[in-house]
Swiss-Prot record:
InterPro entries in UniProt: Battenin_disease_Cln3, Battenin_disease_Cln3_subgr, MFS_trans_sf
Protein name: Protein BTN1
Function: Involved in vacuolar transport and vacuole pH homeostasis. Also required for cytokinesis.
Presence of the UniProt keyword Nucleus in the record: no
Compartments it resides in: Vacuole membrane
Entry similarity comment: Belongs to the battenin family.
Main location group: membrane
SUPFAM superfamilies (UniProt xref): MFS general substrate transporter
Annotated Pfam families: CLN3
Signal peptide boundaries: 1-29
Organism of this sequence: Eremothecium gossypii (strain ATCC 10895 / CBS 109.51 / FGSC 9923 / NRRL Y-1056) (Yeast)
UniProt keyword terms in alphabetical order: Amino-acid transport, Membrane, Signal, Transmembrane, Transmembrane helix, Transport, Vacuole
Transmembrane regions listed in the UniProt entry: 41-61, 70-90, 91-111, 131-151, 154-174, 234-254, 281-300, 307-329, 334-356
GO cellular component terms attached to this protein's record: fungal-type vacuole; vacuolar membrane; vacuole
Amino acid sequence: MDRRKLIFGKFWLFGLLNNVLYVVILAAAVDIVGPTLPKSLILLADILPSFLVKLVAPFFIDRVEYHYRIWSLIALSGFGMLLVASGRLGVCIVGIVLASISSGVGEITFLQLTHYFSHVALNGWSSGTGGAGLAGSFLYMLLTSILKIPVSRSLLLFSILPIGFLLYFTLQVERTAYEPLASGHFMEAEDNSGSVISLEAPRTTVDNARDCASRPRLAALRERIEVTMRRLKVLVVPYMIPLSTVYLFEYLINQGVSPTLMFPIHEGYGTSQLFHKYRDIYVAYGTLYQLGVFISRSSGSWVRIRGLYLLSVLQFLNLVILLIQSWYYVIHSVWVIMAIVLYEGLLGGASYVNSFLNISEDVPLAEREFSLGAVSISDSSGTLVAAFIGILLEPVLCSHQVKTGRPWCQLE
């Protein structure tokens, strides 16, 4: 097999494996907490540990060898899913936290690994993370809603997936050709066309530490923080705010509003043959959302959107429409709501891919690597805020529905 295709395939699998459990856990939120507790509790447990890992990892992650990280991914995510499958809420939350830590470490690890290969590795990783959303939500719907496999057994099956990270060890031979040399020297690497080019190796942490050794540590730290803040400041308005707000609105929909977008299930109603339980509707919403995300994340090469704030406005309108639906029940067709959820996913995926494409095209080369890494935390921050708001929002919506004769949000 062509080496470039092989690398693409391996990193595609790494992206899939690293993100699929995050998606499965969100899809299973209604089954983990039941109909009476807010689903945003699961979103919070699923995103907060990963978010914290991304914040602190730059200070220590370079000291941890890759093979140790891979074994930690397998242990954390595998054991975490075993706990999630236990069926006890407290134990499930602990398992979700472990899986979330694994996801955060995995994202940092594999993004760093792409440095040792041509750009095809980064393309494979990005595509795999998009595929994880669709695969995870669809597989969970297939196992629980269609095949009727019990939730605990379905979640137990997913605990096997982290073993696939062992594929990393087949990269060792390939990686040696891209090992960085000491600062000031040169190494050979492949560009996107497969030809060999000469690149100066990046400065190492040791090099930077030596530069700071002659200055007081506190002064050096203060200077570094000031420089970093200046670099971040120019990214906030054009990239970080629109991306974070899109994710804020869409995850408010997914975890705060969607659990209340229920319809009656009985003979003579259009949903009776498609859905057997109310939780099936919620799982279907998740699958459609991930389908939209996958489609739009894969369309960046032929559909380009420069106005990122337009996507934020459109996603906000989706939130408003679905809030009105949850409160007043103005739309009596589940198909219309499913179409809106699919459209919501399209907007979310488009915001993600176009944000980073815009950075790649607009930001100077010297700042591009930093900018891509810095802006990547925007989606997590928006999701995190949505989790806190959703914990309060869903009970309010569901309580109002029960009072107005629509108790479906409390039923299984």
